[in-house]
């Protein structure tokens, strides 16, 4: 399986901005999640972010919160998510990034959690509520099992911390495009361009922009501003949840293709 860093390196060689879709594990079911991962992989995703449903998702907007609630109500738990991943990941071209809050990691233990995640075939990890001051232990232990822990920079992040986050972040840097939670918005805030420029002054690591990227034109905008990846979550989660499972899978396939087209450089 290809690492997150290797994937970004190959994309940079082709001057290609990555597409990173996000879906919630277990919504509408783990069986459909497995199919959705394969659909996204086949329809142009460069990397895929998979959210572990959690009861108190502070960074998530209403669409992803509702998906997590539905998944938990159906009994979706971490062990079942990892079991599903272990069957699907070996057949994916795209590296798989697990999005989880810190509480499940803490309760399981950092080392056992990371070992199980690595054994399942996960290549990257995003923990939105992990403070920088507590990240070093997770970073070290994640690297030991071949997992890259990506850290987040937000519009509210003090400039004094941006360089420290950029230095520690592995795989890429996750740039949050707006204050507040995830969700679909009508446009990408202009502040994102400024933040991209600030980050590019202190690091040459890839930068992915997420939160509020919900339309092909949003993805193209962040690409034109110099982002290395467009991360799209709520718009995929919403489409997958609408209609029958088969209709949801068809909808995310179409949407994935439209985003990929928007991110394809014009000769």
UniProtKB/Swiss-Prot annotation:
Name assigned to this protein: Tryptophan synthase alpha chain
Keyword Oxidoreductase carried by entry: no
Pfam families: Trp_syntA
GO CC annotations on file: cytosol
Active site: 49, 60
PROSITE patterns: TRP_SYNTHASE_ALPHA (PS00167)
InterPro entries found in the cross-reference section: Aldolase_TIM, RibuloseP-bd_barrel, Trp_synthase_alpha_AS, Trp_synthase_suA
Pathway: Amino-acid biosynthesis; L-tryptophan biosynthesis; L-tryptophan from chorismate: step 5/5
């Amino acid at each position: 399986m290809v690492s997150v860093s290797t994937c970004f390196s190959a994309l940079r060689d082709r001057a290609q901005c990555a597409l990173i879709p996000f879906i919630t594990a277990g919504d509408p079911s783990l069986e459909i999640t497995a199919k959705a991962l394969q659909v996204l992989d086949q329809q142009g995703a460069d990397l895929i972010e998979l959210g572990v449903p959690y009861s108190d998702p502070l960074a998530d907007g209403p669409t992803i919160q509702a998906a997590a609630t539905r998944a938990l109500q159906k009994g979706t738990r971490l062990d079942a998510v990892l079991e599903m991943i272990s069957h699907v990941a070996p057949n994916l071209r795209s590296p798989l990034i697990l999005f989880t809050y810190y509480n499940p990691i803490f309760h399981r233990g950092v080392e056992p959690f990371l070992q199980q995640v690595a054994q399942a075939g996960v290549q990257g990890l995003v923990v939105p509520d992990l403070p920088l001051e507590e990240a070093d232990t997770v970073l070290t232990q994640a690297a030991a099992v071949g997992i890259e822990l990506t850290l987040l920079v937000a519009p509210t992040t003090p400039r004094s911390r941006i360089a420290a986050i950029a230095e520690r972040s592995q795989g890429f840097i996750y740039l949050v495009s707006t204050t507040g939670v995830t969700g679909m918005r009508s446009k990408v805030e202009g502040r994102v361009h400024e933040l991209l420029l600030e980050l590019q002054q202190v690091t040459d690591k890839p930068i992915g922009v997420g939160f509020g990227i919900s339309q092909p034109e949003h993805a193209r905008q962040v690409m034109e501003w110099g982002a290395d990846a467009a991360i799209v979550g709520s718009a995929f989660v919403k489409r997958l949840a609408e209609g029958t499972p088969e209709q949801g899978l068809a909808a995310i396939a179409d949407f994935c293709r439209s985003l990929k087209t928007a991110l394809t450089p014009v000769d």
